């Protein structure tokens, strides 16, 4: 195993992540540069859908990444897809998640604390904070190093990896 030669102290140092030590990344995604899509990602395990797989502060992912998103009222993200399942699990506040088809038909799902949605691979989805308070929620994806999200909007899709140039 990869930890065979490590002491318990070394394992604890590398495989424990604390909220206070995770820096919020306000440029984790290309669409986060746009008003209405601003949000911060705190990476605990891996990089999630940000594509920032070189983040040495996060615990190395094996089977899945885990991050915490912070979203102010009125903000969210652009409709997008992944090649793997994505889960939003609300910790604090309220979040409106959505799924939509290729024609733009959308279903909104209001989630509160301790509620979640699992978005299947290839299904267009996203979220917005329509409440008056910030929301914190956990995000997990179904592969250790998923590809950068694919945006439904062609104008966002083309530069979807530009944010990685400054990473």
Which role does the model predict for each range below?
Residues 63, 68-73, 81-101, 140-143:
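Short, conserved beta-strand element in jelly-roll/cupin
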Residues 101-121:
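Short acidic-glycine-tyrosine-enriched beta hairpin
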Residues 1-62, 155-167:
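A short, N-terminal "cap"/entry segment at the start of jelly-roll beta-barrel domains
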Residues 57, 102-106, 133:
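Short, solvent-exposed loop/turn segments that connect beta-strands within catalytic domains
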Residues 1, 10, 124-167:
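Double-stranded beta-helix
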Residues 66, 76, 85, 106, ...:
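A structural connector/turn signal
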Residues 77-80, 97-99, 119, 125-131:
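Short beta-strand His + acidic residue motifs that chelate non-heme Fe in jelly-roll/DSBH
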Residues 47-54, 65-82, 121:
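Conserved short histidine dyad/triad with adjacent acidic residue
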């Amino acid at each position: 195993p990869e930890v065979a030669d490590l002491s318990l102290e070394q394992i604890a140092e590398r495989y424990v992540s604390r909220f206070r030590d995770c820096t919020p990344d306000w440029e984790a995604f290309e669409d986060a540069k746009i008003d209405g899509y601003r949000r911060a990602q705190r990476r605990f395990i891996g990089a999630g859908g940000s594509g920032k797989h070189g983040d040495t502060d996060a615990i190395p992912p094996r089977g899945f990444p885990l991050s915490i998103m912070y979203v102010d009222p009125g903000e969210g993200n652009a409709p997008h897809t992944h090649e793997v399942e994505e889960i939003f699990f609300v910790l604090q506040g309220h979040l409106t998640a959505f799924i939509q088809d290729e024609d733009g038909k959308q279903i909104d799902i209001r989630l509160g604390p301790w509620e979640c949605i699992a978005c299947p691979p290839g299904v267009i989805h996203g979220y917005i904070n329509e409440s008056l308070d910030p929301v914190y929620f956990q995000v997990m994806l179904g592969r250790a190093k998923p590809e950068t999200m694919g945006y439904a909007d062609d104008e966002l899709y083309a530069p979807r990896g530009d944010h990685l140039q400054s990473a």
